[in-house]
């Protein structure tokens, strides 16, 4: 499987980097073959750490960028290329993508439609919480990408019941599409794997 994340050690912008690093490490312990595709403008290419995590770090080929939206949309092209390379190197054995927050949703949707790979949309935060002006054009575009992800995903993963209710409030997300798995729970990784397994039993649309 592939994990898409816009932050991953050593590039750390917040708690998401630590969470994804922990997730990948725990999946490896459960014998899941996992690749992390992430952004790093100063350290690019493939690297496998001592913990077994296989990471592809990509950079933005288009400079300069005018805002976070143009930056991420151009970066998605690189994410798609790397994911396709992984898919073909694995002889089409790539089963699932887990996308963390909105940044790589366009790539996940493209790969779902082109290669029939389902994806999970793991949501750590949403635009109405991040932006002070979430009715402006930039925030409206990001919210549209988040809505696209929720419409196209096979399942939404959140860390709390509160976030589940926020998705229903702001995006009218379907209750039965949202799984709550708290990273504080002792059986956290088993809950994640149970969600993954359910999706592998249903072909991508």
What residues fall within each predicted segment?
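N-terminal subdomain of nucleotide-sugar transferases
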Residues: 1-44, 48, 186-196, 200-205
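Histidine-centered beta-alpha loop that forms part of the nucleotide-sugar donor binding/catalytic region
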Residues: 6, 123-126, 182-183
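A conserved catalytic-core segment of Leloir-type glycosyltransferases
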Residues: 33-91, 180-183, 189, 193
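Alpha-helix capping/helix-boundary segments
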Residues: 42, 103-104, 162-164
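Short His-centered aromatic/hydrophobic patch
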Residues: 99-104, 123
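Active-site proximal beta-strand in glycosyltransferases
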Residues: 109-130
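Membrane-proximal helix-turn-helix segments that form the acceptor-binding/catalytic region
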Residues: 138-156
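Helix-loop-beta element that forms the nucleotide-linked donor phosphate-binding surface
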Residues: 164-184
């Amino acid at each position: 499987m592939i994990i898409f994340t816009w932050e991953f050690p050593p590039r750390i912008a917040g708690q998401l980097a630590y969470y994804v690093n922990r997730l990948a490490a725990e999946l490896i312990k459960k014998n899941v073959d996992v690749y992390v595709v992430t952004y790093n403008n100063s350290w690019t290419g493939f690297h496998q750490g001592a913990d077994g995590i296989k990471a592809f770090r990509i950079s933005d080929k288009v400079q300069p960028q005018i805002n976070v939206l143009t930056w991420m949309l151009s970066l998605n092209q690189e994410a798609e290329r790397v994911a396709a390379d992984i898919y073909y190197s694995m002889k089409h054995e790539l089963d699932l993508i887990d996308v963390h927050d909105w940044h790589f949703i366009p790539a996940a949707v493209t790969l779902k439609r082109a290669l029939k790979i389902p994806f999970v949309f793991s949501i750590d935060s949403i635009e109405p919480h991040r932006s002070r002006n979430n009715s402006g054009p930039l925030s409206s575009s990001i919210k549209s990408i988040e809505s696209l992800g929720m419409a196209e995903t096979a399942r939404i993963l959140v860390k709390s019941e509160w976030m589940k209710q926020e998705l229903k409030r702001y995006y009218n997300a379907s209750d039965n599409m949202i799984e709550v798995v708290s990273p504080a729970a002792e059986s956290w990784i088993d809950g994640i794997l149970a969600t993954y397994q359910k999706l592998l039993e249903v072909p991508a649309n």
